[in-house]
Swiss-Prot record:
A motif (CysB motif) lies at residues 1362-1388. In eukaryotes there are five DNA polymerases: alpha, beta, gamma, delta, and epsilon which are responsible for different reactions of DNA synthesis. It comes from Drosophila melanogaster (Fruit fly). Zn(2+) 1 binds at C1296, C1299, C1324, C1329. Component of the alpha DNA polymerase complex (also known as the alpha DNA polymerase-primase complex) consisting of four subunits: the catalytic subunit PolA1, the regulatory subunit PolA2, and the primase complex subunits Prim1 and Prim2 respectively. PolA1 associates with the DNA primase complex before association with PolA2. Interacts with Dpit47; the interaction inhibits the activity of the DNA polymerase and occurs only in proliferating cells but not in quiescent cells. One of its GO terms (biological process) is lagging strand elongation. It is found in: Nucleus. Residues 99-113 have a biased composition (Basic residues). This is DNA polymerase alpha catalytic subunit. Inhibited by N2-(p-n-butylphenyl) deoxyguanosine 5'-triphosphate and N2-(p-n-butylphenyl) deoxyadenosine 5'-triphosphate. DNA synthesis is not inhibited by fungal toxin alpha-amaitin. The 3'-5' exonuclease activity is inhibited by 10mM dGMP.
Length: 1488
């Protein structure tokens, strides 16, 4: 068989003598001996006796539907079976050629004739397929039962399927899947981590149970149904065996009795490619094309009897901790099928009576809206459902463009375009628009009127009054826009507003439609030619005929929607390098109520369709395995084209309102749309609800027009915080699943699972299981109810809310608010002026909002106080302001309408007066806050039903999210309501409030150890929980009485706090339960152990160290335990006890691997490129790449020795080995060192010693770091000895002009004979030389000057060295990237760069030179007497050095910085006139 379905299959050859004919020969030889064939059950008719016409008809049915296109047109039946063709099994080359000539090709067939080919070998040979099967061990005795071929024949004769099943199980042994080893690795890693962290021995029985677990047991536990009570009302459908999609015979059966999801209406096999056909499994076909009514009844009765029979207990019983939802999904399909009767009736009901009269009123629930401003301008499509479940498409036409023409103050001269003295009137504007703009746009008619509007925003290049008269113009929305270029100047029109507003926005604002709601439509027409796939489609020419339904009393709930969850499996085609679909699972619910708690399970119909990857063939035991598979309805197709055609047919019947998927751009919806378009599947637009002919290209969501798309991954990124947002992590964090309850299937595992039929059924179950997890995640996170509430609050569309467009939500909220207040809204920014990032990628936090064109923040963000680093074992009180920025906006009435933009962008605007009317922005926030308070009051009501409780909770969450994100639109540069001056004013008041609160707390004699934007950490110095809360209440009352809207509250109490630096801390958070007992819970922020780009080994060790540091032991015992843990992990790594998965490092690709410019220093990029190239992986932007650092026999850097874990496992001759030194020095050591660096009693060198590393490197780096930190700190102690101060300085060297001997000068004197001392300038160091240095004093002075210049030049060369012990890279250049406030090393990318020669070093060196010539500071007990000439010489050299020192500003000490903390405390006291001292002269800096 060929490797690719696109190549013709080679002819079969009779080369296997031990095959079918050899078996028949053995059967003949056994005839007449004692080994007789005994058939237990007498069979009347083994073969049917028919005439030649009937035989030809049956043979045609058998072969025609399998591989002949167009139902066999052009072919003639030769009345032979395939095994009668001797030429097909001929050994000779000539026989093969003759057989090809005999077969021929029909003239009308589309099949191309086969070319002469050489005998296929290797994987392409059919031998390879059979050789993969596990051979059966032969017995010594020969009997009929032992003959496989005879057993197959008898199995076909017998009617009992059990005998065939038993025999097939003996022939085809189940193969173990490769994912088992990975599961064992994960289990071992999990067990090791638990034992390391908890130090608790696992029970022997549980450990044996974990070791005995396998994929088969897990899937049996998942798939085998529990014993259920029989239910006679269960509706049963077609058998979940493989369906070959035959053409049905025309029967007079009624349409209403057909299964809406049956595949008998269309033959998708005709869409299969010829090369993709596979004929072997046809000999084992289990279903006939047509069945009689009696046979169907018998089948139904047998199924009922089978379902009603009590289930036998299975050995693989599920765990007690398994959730009920999972058991309903995969263990109890009978209860799910119970809902299918209603499902079928509802679907058929919606298809009937879909016509509607134009005289009637149409009332429907609007879900989604769509417009195409290019192809259909001025039109909007609304999609929804009626109360009886019919899908509706409303086409609204004639939505006019609305322009607001701002008049100039004076008319412009038509020629010079300079202002004249003539004032502009509304008539002037009308005339210019009629004569110039209307003619240019070719307007046949337009309407205009004079209106008074307000404008409160900033327009670039023009000055717009806050309120004035405008000319409002309405014209056909299909006409183009007026000329808005900057070069175009109108004589009377200063600016045209509203030109960029699209039809959908105008329609929603004019009709006051805020999200999904009930709409009532009158005056419509039924479309004669439908443009949609909905049950009901009407066209409306008057937009005003769309009205909101005003119900008296409680509003009517929304109708149930139809939900469809999709999960797609893909494989890479190595020839085309494209992802091809090989499996699609579908879960659907046709009555999913969004305003009620989600049903359990969240679907009432399920099915799965599959085809084979291009590089594999169907396994021989597939039909047998699928006959036993009862977990879902499976549809098998022989090509991707047939699969997608079937999918579109089912998709259209379901007519879903909501599509649920996970990471739609990752081989899910994108692959479906790409392959449907690429394969040219007819009517591809059925993916959406509009009948379209042209694809949208890369605009994925527009293929699903009219249907909401819920991407669970994207919604989870907005709803929760997680280490990663892949499906495995979300299932573990949200659904509380265990590692054994989900299996990840990668590309390699997928191909291996297609080798056996049993593995394919497992793959189907895993695909269905993942699909059910998507629905559970959507329901657990309340994605749809929350999106509905947010959309109703903001007034945008559901699709944009589900896509995470936070900026657009706020934009529509303000659009509705300003429109209701008769304001002109700002124009949309052109797309060309925006960055490529969408709303979901934009930072909307406000404090971090930056212009991408600028290198620094456009305005100052939130205030972050300098932390007092250390370990706090007394209780620390955490307090924060509730919704600080929204409260500031309300407190100071900050709005577009109340605050004027300053002329200078760097200046802060002035706050409005207290008598100013509240602005629109504060009013909207007040409405949101008060609404949330009212909802929370309703939640506190007793006897509240679960449905109302859920609705109130989701409502208050939506109000909170909307209010907290309102500030974001002010600071987001690409927002339509961007107002930098307002955002800067809000953050300025936030910094001011935090500073005032800090000072107030300090006045109460409490230390604020840290503060960040809206929170404070206060050290109480006590360990009484209740007393700490009393202190918090006192602080709260003192602060809150200063403000009206701002509210400071207690956020928690830390029993122990490890404060490392800004935004990095760990703490034990205390809380009391209902019984008054204290509960301890760890809280981490910014630490390495919460980041995913560290290995699990480093994270595990870091957590163990953190547990010890935050424990209640004394500090010495903590450090001893930490050191013991490190020595233990060092030993276990050396012994190979640590499981391999713990060494895996995970990093995310921020772009496509090919787009990285310098991938050599990025290990995850190297691994992604290599795996994509060599192992057919599909790593792309946003994916997480796992790798390990190995020793590969090269001298490359560690970052260039990264390999995937699979590469390490499959390495030949153990060429790859783990680099344990890398993990000790680059993973464990830095993580632990950063945690304990603030503790006294340990340091980096001690940690290195515990890990078996060289501690000297870390001591040197610690000294360098200490020197730099000492240099940067202004308060270094000056009480040092001369030896301590100048121990690293170099002595002064000069050369004698006579003997050329180098003179070494460490002080003014050098030792002489008999313990005496001699002045250095008095005598040459060489005793034979008679020339004293004082005689060439000028030369000595010049050499001193040159020496000082060398030291200065050395400093300005700015040589840097990496502080990482394994790097020590020297360089003079550095990047702007910082690490710990120092430049990042570009070589290792893990260390920071330190100066080799710092300002402190230079200053000490110069001071040392000056000290040499200062005779008064020499500490000799008996100083020699010097002549006046020598004293003057020393004084001259002293002044030379001192003059150099005076030119340096390093000698100036800033007392304001030195005593900053003391001055801050003094500022809190009543001000007293004090002398201001800024600096002191250099003389004080020289005190020793």
């Amino acid at each position: 068989m060929s490797e690719s379905p696109s190549e013709p299959r080679a002819k079969r050859q009779r080369v296997d003598k031990n095959g079918r004919f050899a078996a028949m020969e053995r059967l003949r030889q056994l005839k007449g001996t004692k080994n007789k064939c005994k058939v237990e059950d007498q069979v009347d008719d083994v073969y049917d006796v028919v005439d030649e016409r009937e035989y030809a008809k049956r043979a045609q049915e058998k072969y025609g539907d399998d591989w002949i296109e167009e139902d066999g047109t052009g072919y003639a039946e030769d009345l032979r079976d395939f095994f009668e063709d001797e030429d097909e099994y001929s050994d000779g080359e000539e026989d093969r050629k003759d057989s090809k000539k005999k077969k021929g090709v029909a003239p009308n067939s589309k099949k191309r004739p086969r070319e002469n080919e050489k005998p296929v070998t290797g994987k392409a040979s059919i031998k390879n397929l059979f050789s993969n099967a596990v051979p059966k061990k032969m017995d010594v005795k020969t009997s009929v039962k032992d003959d496989d071929i005879l057993a197959d024949i008898l199995g076909e004769i017998k009617e009992e399927p059990a005998a065939t099943s038993e025999k097939a199980e003996k022939v085809i042994a189940p193969a173990k899947i490769s994912v088992t080893s990975r599961k064992f690795d994960a289990a071992a890693a999990k067990e090791y981590m638990n034992s390391f962290l908890n130090n608790i021995k696992v029970q022997e029985q549980e450990r044996k149970k974990a070791e005995a677990s396998s994929d088969n047991e897990m899937l049996e536990r998942i798939l085998k149904p529990k014993a259920a009570v029989p239910n006679t009302k269960v509706a049963f459908f077609s058998s979940p065996t493989i369906k070959k999609e035959p053409m049905p015979e025309k029967t007079p059966a009624k349409k209403a009795t057909e299964d809406p999801f049956s595949d008998n209406e269309m033959d998708f096999s005709c869409l299969d490619d010829d090369e993709n056909q596979f004929d072997v499994e046809k000999t084992q076909q289990t279903e006939k094309v047509s069945q009689t009514k009696t046979a169907a009844e018998k089948t139904s009765q047998s199924k009922v009897a089978e379902k009603s029979a009590p289930k036998k207990e299975t050995t693989g019983s599920p765990k007690e901790s398994e959730s009920e939802d999972i058991s309903r999904l995969l263990n109890n399909w009978e209860s799910i099928c119970q809902m299918d009767d209603d499902f079928e009736k509802s679907v058929l009901t919606t298809e009937q009576d879909s016509t509607i009269s134009s005289d009637q009123q149409l009332r429907f629930w609007y879900w989604e809206a769509y417009e195409d401003p290019v192809k259909m301008p001025g039109e909007v499509f609304l999609f929804g459902r009626t109360a009886d479940g019919k899908s509706v498409c409303l086409r609204v036409q004639n939505i006019n463009r609305v322009l607001y023409l701002l008049p100039r103050q004076f008319l412009l001269d038509p020629i010079s375009k300079e202002p004249t003295k003539q004032k502009v009137t509304v008539a002037d504007i009308y005339k210019e628009f009629d004569s110039e703009v209307a003619n240019q746009l070719k307007l046949e008619f337009f309407r205009s009127r004079k209106v008074t509007k307000s404008f409160a925003h900033h327009a670039i290049g023009i000055e717009v009054p806050q309120s004035c008269d405008y000319l409002e113009v309405h014209y056909d929305g299909k006409k183009p826009l007026p000329n808005l270029s900057a070069d175009k100047k109108y004589n009377s029109i200063a600016h045209i507003f509203g030109a960029t507003t699209n039809a959908l926005e105008r329609f929603l604002l004019d009709r006051k439609i805020k999200g999904p709601c009930w709409l009532q439509v009158t005056g419509f027409k039924v479309s004669p030619t439908p443009m949609s796939w909905c049950n009901t489609e009407v066209t409306l020419t008057e937009p005003k005929n769309v009205e909101l339904v005003q119900d008296k009393g409680k509003p009517a709930p929304p109708p149930p929607l139809t939900l469809l969850s999709l999960n797609v499996r893909t494989s890479m085609n190595p020839k085309t390098s494209r992802n091809e679909i090989c499996m699609i699972s579908m879960l659907t619910h046709n009555r999913f109520h969004i305003d009620r708690p989600a049903p359990q399970p969240a679907f009432n119909r399920h099915m799965c369709a599959l085809t084979r990857p291009a590089v594999v063939s169907w396994p021989l035991d597939l039909n047998f395995e699928m006959a036993k598979y009862k977990s879902t309805t499976v549809h098998k197709h022989d090509s991707e084209r047939a699969l997608l055609s079937w999918f579109l047919a089912q998709y259209q019947k379901i007519d879903a309102d909501l599509i649920v998927t996970f990471d739609s751009m990752d081989c899910q919806l994108n692959v479906i749309t790409d392959q449907i378009v690429a394969l040219k599947i007819p009517q591809w637009s059925r993916m959406g609800r509009l009948r379209l002919s042209q694809s949208f290209g890369k605009r994925l969501l527009e293929h699903f027009v009219g249907r909401m798309v819920c991407d669970v991954k994207r919604s989870a990124e907005e709803c929760i915080r997680a280490r990663s947002y892949d499906l495995q992590t979300l299932c573990k964090q949200v659904l509380k699943l265990k590692e054994s309850e989900r299996m990840e299937v990668n590309a390699d595992d997928l191909l291996e699972m297609y080798e056996k039929g049993e593995s394919i059924t497992k793959l189907i179950s895993l695909t269905m299981q993942d699909n059910s997890y998507l629905l559970r995640l959507m329901c657990e996170l309340n994605i749809m109810p929350l999106a509905l509430q947010i959309t109703n609050i903001c007034g945008n569309t559901m699709t944009r809310t589900l896509q995470g467009g936070r900026s657009e939500r706020n934009e529509f909220l303000l659009l509705h608010a300003f429109h209701e207040k008769n304001y002109i809204v700002p124009d949309k920014k052109p797309v060309s002026k925006r960055s490529g990032a969408g709303d979901t990628d934009a930072t909307l936090s406000g404090a971090d909002a930056t212009m991408q064109t600028k290198k620094k923040a456009a305005y100052a963000g939130g205030l972050v106080l300098e932390p007092m680093r250390g370990l706090y074992e007394k209780y620390v009180l955490l307090m924060d302001f509730n919704s600080l920025y929204p409260s500031i906006i309300q407190e100071y009435n900050i709005c577009f309408t109340t605050v004027q933009q300053p002329v200078d962008a760097d200046e802060l605007p002035t706050l409005p007066d207290s008598k100013t009317e509240p602005g629109i922005l504060p009013l909207q926030l007040k409405r949101l806050v008060e609404s949330r308070k009212e909802v929370k009051k309703l939640m506190a009501a007793p006897d509240l039903s679960p449905e109302l409780q859920m609705q109130y909770h989701i409502r208050q969450m939506a109000l909170k999210l909307t209010a907290n994100s309102m500030y974001g639109c002010l600071g987001f540069a690409h927002s339509r309501f961007f107002a930098q001056h307002l955002a800067a004013l809000v953050t300025h008041k936030g910094r001011e409030i935090l500073t005032n609160t800090q000072q107030l707390v300090q006045k109460m004699n409490y230390d604020v150890v840290y503060g960040d934007t809206d929170s404070l950490m206060i050290n109480t110095n006590i360990t009484d929980y209740d007393q700490v809360y009393k202190i918090g209440h006192n602080i709260k009352q003192s602060v809150n009485k200063l403000y009206k809207q701002l509210e400071l509250d207690i956020d928690g109490v830390f029993g122990c706090l490890l404060l490392l630096k800004k935004k990095k801390y760990a703490a034990i958070k205390l809380s009391k339960d209902s019984k008054g007992n204290l509960r301890r819970e760890q809280e981490h922020k910014g630490l390495d152990i919460v980041r995913r780009d560290w290995s699990q080994l480093a994270v595990m060790v870091g957590k163990a160290v953190l547990d010890e540091v935050l424990s209640e032991k004394p500090l010495e015992e903590k450090l001893d335990a930490v050191h013991a843990q490190l020595e233990k992990i060092k030993t276990q790594i050396a012994e190979g006890v640590v499981p391999l998965p713990l060494f895996v490092i995970t990093k995310q690709l921020t772009r496509t691997p090919q787009e990285y410019a310098n991938s050599a220093s990025l290990p995850h990029v190297q691994v992604a490129l290599r795996m994509n190239r060599e192992r057919n992986r599909r790593y792309k932007k946003g994916d997480m790449v796992d790798y390990v650092i190995c020793l590969d026999g090269t001298t490359n850097a560690a970052m260039q020795r990264a390999y995937h874990l699979d590469e390490l496992k499959t390495s030949e001759d153990k060429k790859l080995q783990l680099d344990t030194n890398y993990y000790l020095g680059h993973q464990i050591h830095p993580v632990v060192t950063r945690m304990v660096e603030v503790l006294e009693g340990t340091d980096a060198s001690r940690i290195a010693e515990c890990l078996g590393m060289d501690p000297t490197k870390f001591r040197q780096n610690a000294q360098r770091t200490q020197r730099e930190n000492t240099e940067q700190s202004e308060g270094e102690s000056l009480l040092k000895t001369t030896l301590q101060l100048y121990r690293l300085c170099e002595p002064f060297r000069f050369q004698c002009v006579t003997c050329k001997t180098e003179q070494l000068m460490a002080s003014a004197y050098r030792p002489g004979p008999s313990n005496s001392h001699i002045a250095v300038l008095q005598q040459c160091a060489k005793s034979e030389c008679q020339t004293a240095p004082i005689q060439y004093l000028a030369s000595v002075r010049n050499q001193l000057q040159l020496s000082m210049r060398q030291y200065v030049q050395r400093f300005y060369k700015n040589w840097l060295v990496c502080d990482h012990p394994d790097c020590n890279f020297n360089t003079r250049t550095h990047s702007l990237r910082k690490k710990s406030h120092r430049p990042l090393c570009q070589k290792c990318r893990s260390g920071s760069l330190l100066r080799q020669y710092t300002e402190r070093d230079l200053y000490n060196q110069l001071c040392y030179l000056r000290f040499m010539f200062d005779l008064g500071k020499q500490t000799l007990q008996q100083k020699p007497t010097l002549t006046p000439e020598l004293e003057q010489a020393y004084q001259l050299l002293y002044e030379t050095v001192d003059q150099q020192l005076q030119s340096s500003s390093y000698v100036i000490i800033s007392l304001s910085k030195l005593f900053a903390r003391s001055l801050a405390q003094m500022s809190l006291q009543p001000s007293v006139a004090q002398p201001q001292i800024e600096a002191i002269p250099s003389a004080l800096a020289d005190v020793v």
